[in-house]
């Protein structure tokens, strides 16, 4: 990943973990990772739930509560992208209960992996460059401090 504004580094680290999980989800659903079959799918679903609880949930909250509002306010061209990213967050949240399923779990895991990868790529390739381009206007250093503090606190409490 390209060098990022220091305030985005915690989010980019989460993205690295998310991309690795997304790849494992798709490969698991395609039977390319052992154990295959229902056992492998259950293991991967558990891994997704663990990462969601440990990182993704607080990551989404940090973006929705800190990053997205500031960007929407100061970078009007980001509004449509942010609306799409918010829908992605909601779609991930809606899929979480489906990871308990026994029927159709392969499709759920594949689709979640696909959604997560596309979402992360859009943030890294579209949203973060906009943030960096408008860093002075949106108060990037203040946002960076708020993001860092929020994520530290949220993950300490989990």
Give the positions of each predicted feature.
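Small-residue-biased structural context
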Residues: 1-158
